[in-house]
Structures are given as C-alpha cells and as structure tokens.
Design a protein with these regions (language model features):
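N-terminal pre-Walker A segment at the start of P-loop NTPase domains
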Residues: 1-17
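Hydrophobic anchor at the beta1->P-loop junction of P-loop NTPases
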Residues: 22-24
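Conserved lysine of the Walker
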Residues: 32
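Conserved nucleotide-sensing/catalytic segment adjacent to the nucleotide-binding pocket
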Residues: 49-115
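A short helix-turn-beta junction within AAA+ P-loop NTPase domains corresponding to the substrate/partner-engaging
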Residues: 125-138
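Hydrophobic positions on the alpha1 helix immediately C-terminal to the Walker A/P-loop
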Residues: 35
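Active-site signature of alpha/beta-hydrolase-fold catalytic machinery across serine-
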Residues: 38, 42
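The conserved Walker
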Residues: 27-28, 91
Length: 138
C-alpha cells in the first residue's frame, strides 16, 4: 500500500506535472490527522510539521512564500480540520474567496494537499470538486 501511494501521488507531483488534493473524513479520534501526516511524510521526504496548516490565512501566506522561492513542486501540505477554516458557512469571507482562487490554480504549482474534516459537507464545494482522493476513517 505504501509503495502504491508513494508511486501514484509522487508521480503526479513530480513526473506528470499535476497536483494532488485529498480529503480524510471521520469523527474525532478516528486517526485523520495521523494518517494525513504519514501520507505526507511518505510522499514528500522533506515534509515537516511546519507544513501543517490550521486556517486559510496561514496557508495562503505560506504558499506565497514558497512560490516566491520557487519551492512548490512536489511539496505536501496538510490542512488539518479544514472545515473549521474553510467550511461551507464561510464561503463569502475574504480568506475563503482567496483560498478558492488559489485552489483553482494550485495545479500549476504541482503540490499535494490533504484536508482533514469531520464530514465532507464541512469542506467548501469548490474544494470538493478539485479532490482526487477521498478516504473515510471509521
């Protein structure tokens, strides 16, 4: 399983000039965060805790820094409990609008993003349409 995940996701980011967006869904304590961190570490050997984001503003700020330094290709990012920062109820907020614009063009950056949420409904509909993988934790 590890080899398949690494080969498929790493290949998308580093060989096929694509992005990767996934979501891990499940109740509190189901292992979403741990699993997302392990996947990110497996795919991207340079992954560190500094690439775990908890709100859109942090993610947007960090993305701008990576883009300016030309350091986006192949990077994995975990947006933990994404529903708190980018849920459907905040669709009209300034950060939400900015984040949706970033998600529209993120494919050009060849990055991997893993969201964790309690329910898929907690993730904005625009983000859901861009997902490449869905995993439900029980």
């Amino acid at each position: 399983m590890q080899q398949v995940l690494r080969q498929e996701i790493w290949g998308r980011l580093n060989e096929r000039n694509q992005h990767f967006m996934a979501v891990l869904v499940g109740p509190e304590g189901s292992g979403k965060s741990y699993t997302s961190l392990k996947i990110a570490e497996l795919v991207d050997p340079t992954f560190t805790a500094e690439r775990v984001m908890f709100n859109p503003a942090d993610f947007l700020e960090q993305l701008q820094e990576w883009k300016a330094a030309g350091e986006t290709k192949g990077k994995m990012v975990v947006v933990d409990e994404a529903g708190v920062g980018i849920g459907t109820r905040s669709w009209y907020e300034k950060d939400q609008i900015k984040l949706n614009k970033v998600l529209q063009v993120i494919r050009d950056e060849n990055m991997g993003i893993i969201f964790t949420v309690p329910s898929l409904k907690d993730l904005d509909s625009q983000a859901r349409r861009r997902l490449r993988a869905y995993c439900e934790m029980v």
